Amino acid sequence: MGIFSIANQHIRFAVKLATAIVLALFVGFHFQLETPRWAVLTAAIVAAGPAFAAGGEPYSGAIRYRGFLRIIGTFIGCIAGLVIIIAMIRAPLLMILVCCIWAGFCTWISSLVRIENSYAWGLAGYTALIIVITIQPEPLLTPQFAVERCSEIVIGIVCAIMADLLFSPRSIKQEVDRELESLLVAQYQLMQLCIKHGDGEVVDKAWGDLVRRTTALQGMRSNLNMESSRWARANRRLKAINTLSLTLITQSCETYLIQNTRPELITDTFREFFDTPVETAQDVHKQLKRLRRVIAWTGERETPVTIYSWVAAATRYQLLKRGVISNTKINATEEEILQGEPEVKVESAERHHAMVNFWRTTLSCILGTLFWLWTGWTSGSGAMVMIAVVTSLAMRLPNPRMVAIDFIYGTLAALPLGLLYFLVIIPNTQQSMLLLCISLAVLGFFLGIEVQKRRLGSMGALASTINIIVLDNPMTFHFNQFLDSALGQIVGCVLAFTVILLVRDKSRDRTGRVLLNQFVSAAVSAMTTNVARRKENHLPALYQQLFLLMNKFPGDLPKFRLALTMIIAHQRLRDAPIPVNEDLSAFHRQMRRTADHVISARSDDKRRRYFGQLLEELEIYQEKLRIWQAPPQVTEPVHRLTGMLHKYQHALTDS
């Protein structure tokens, strides 16, 4: 496909984006808004953002959800801006500095919350800054400006949603159905690999791929939930399927690890059974029926606990899968499965990374303020806004530097493109609303195609071009003002890029160590006799941390294996029949406190000291288990966990 070619699958969204822009433009001028540009810009960003992220037309509900986040972020930013102005209107410089800190604070929060919701906080940060900068000449008009800005943004969002509904957005349901079938086959094939106990690297690749696919399925569930309320039943089932899929991965990998020390546990009966290849979900269904008969014949005691647990989870997966595909009423059996354990929310391991993002945003905004005050440039305010926009939105993404480069390319491309519209197209079409709409529709159509290709600079070019062309009411054409705005955008992006380069993010190793210590803490916390604590479902949170570890350290197999071993230890200890008495319960609390100290320690010396204390406590705990005559189902996992912690002590404590 050539660089300027247009694929058929890209046309529908390009028309959708053009329609959203035209609707926002028409409504903005029809209601005599002072700056319809904000409505047009909002419609373009809300519609194009999900398409750029997806690399094609977004699924149904994505644009709606992004629009709601933008409304929430705008309202939070407007309220914060009003509070800052009312409190500090007599000290303009202090007011701007507080706004810079507010933008950094919002970036800090956006780095800690779920990535789907981070957009609202990033927007809240720079919206307050835009309000404070814009009202500098006339501060008494602040409430009016805030109301107008909210109105224009809501109009833009409504137009984007209307365009999305008008061009029948594609549903993700069929993709979910296909993935459920394919994932079950992949789970069975992973168990086959683990029972064969072949090449470790092949097994590592297989379970790593399944972790990614399960995480992707969870993202599809979020999209399906946003799409329509009629998928509420499917959404409940998919949430339970996520835990079941992770359980299948855990049991398969434990089967592999058990054979490292006790290969005789997997009998020839099961080895021969799992030799049969499977290609489709129907093949898996037949094999599971046969496997349940084999287990009924051999007896639960003669069946390895990992295989028994795997079959139970796969059977429940199958039952819920059929319910998702048909979207029928939830029956009593399914309801029993869905009434599972409450999921545990784990504390973010990226607190240091979030603090780096705070300083990047705050310092870049302060640098923009100093540049503005020092030069006295009329478009210094525009540069400041772009600094806040780039840093607020880039920081939450995996590669902020590339996002900043995208904005630089986009603002550079917007200069000639905006010049064409400012000097030629808009002056010749402003007398006719039809011609004006057609001219902007053409811009939206072609940039909509490039956005879907994820062309570097395409998203920035779309937003920057709309921002600098004259879409005010009434239209005024001042070339100096246009040039200042265009150059201000470029300078702002360059300054933001400079700060991102200078303020290095060296938090990766610290985040990795915190993640590994959180796995240790989870394994230790599983040693409890508290009934409510044992019913807590840690599995989704643990695999979410594992997925983050895989993204932070691609290809680092020893880290992945250590994390997976800790997850397996957690699951095994969670189900272990630990003797119930006050002596062990008190010691469980002591070990949990020590594990928490390991995570929160700020220096290597403290961390090593607490980790050494944890190892000593585990030795004492093993002695206590012998005194209280704990069964092998308890003593063996604790012994394995202690051995693992001794082996990887330096990796878990040293920077």
Curated annotation (Swiss-Prot):
Q: Which residues cross the membrane?
A: 13-33, 38-58, 69-89, 93-113, 121-141, 152-172, 370-390, 407-427, 431-451, 459-479, 482-502
Example of a GO biological process term? carboxylic acid transport
What keywords appear on the UniProt entry?
Cell inner membrane, Cell membrane, Membrane, Transmembrane, Transmembrane helix, Transport
Major place of residence: membrane
- Subcellular location(s) of the protein: Cell inner membrane
**InterPro entries, per database record:** PHBA_efflux_AaeB/fusaric-R, PHBA_efflux_pump_AaeB
Q: Which GO terms describe its cellular component?
A: plasma membrane
Q: Which domain of life is it from?
A: Bacteria
The stated induction of this gene product is:
Positively coregulated with aaeA and aaeX by AaeR.
* Stored Pfam families: FUSC
Give any GO molecular function from the UniProt entry: transmembrane transporter activity
Q: How does it sit in the membrane?
A: Multi-pass membrane protein
Function, in words: Forms an efflux pump with AaeA. Could function as a metabolic relief valve, allowing to eliminate certain compounds when they accumulate to high levels in the cell.
UniProt lists the family membership as follows: Belongs to the aromatic acid exporter ArAE (TC 2.A.85) family.
Q: Which HAMAP family match?
A: AaeB
Name used for this protein in its record: p-hydroxybenzoic acid efflux pump subunit AaeB
Gene name as annotated: aaeB
